[in-house]
Amino acid sequence: EPEMPIAKQVASEIEVAVWHSDVVMHVPIETAQAAREVAVDNQVDLLVCVGGGSTTGLAKAVALETGIPIVAVPTTYAGSEATNVWGLTEAKRKTTGVDIKVLPETVIYDSKLTLSLPVEMSVASGLNGMAHCVDSLWAPKADPINAALAGEGIRALSAGLPKIVEDSQSIEGRDEALYGAYLSAVSFASAGSGLHHKICHVLGGTFNLPHAQTHA
């Protein structure tokens, strides 16, 4: 639960119905169903997810079935918070889909909340964003607008990640990486998933490989 202190900080001014920290990579369907039951039992009317792609993915799984809106506070550069794409894993088979219900209503980007993300994880996460950008250039619905966003995302990530490697506390580098991650997600959501991303989903779901590192 490395993000719990950050979550406590983020939610300090709101009434929290329940805290839920049972987050698992690739969102196993059992984990998703348990989280849905917690949300319904506690009459949750807003999901605030603080963390990386797995945390956002779990919130999306809850929203998919319940329609509860999401406020996402990302602490990595995965970009999932800015897409309408969901993913669930059952018996080592990962299924993904698109639904407007899983697109967060609000996303809060704060570079200071990413300062505790280790350099190695920061780079892997940023390369996941880079993969979103590359897929956006040739995915099924790629177009000039997607390409422009993806190109800017690549430039931002390429500028920010080396600064983070050089100084993990570089706000400038973290700002650029978050900006690039957002652009990568928006372009990816519009263009659709290319073969590269689908392969990573299959490998990740089958062999339980971490998504960001698989891309990297």
Residue positions per predicted region:
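ATP/NTP phosphate-donor binding region
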Residues: 1-46
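Short, well-ordered alpha-helices that flank and scaffold nucleotide-derived cofactor binding pockets
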Residues: 12, 37, 60-64, 190, ...
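Structural motif
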Residues: 17-18, 45-48, 69-71, 105-107, ...
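A short, small-residue-rich loop immediately preceding and capping a beta-strand
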Residues: 39-62, 66-77
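A glycine/threonine-rich phosphate-anchoring loop and its flanking beta-alpha core
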Residues: 64-148, 152-153
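Active-site segments that bind and position negatively charged phosphate/pyrophosphate groups
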Residues: 136, 140-216
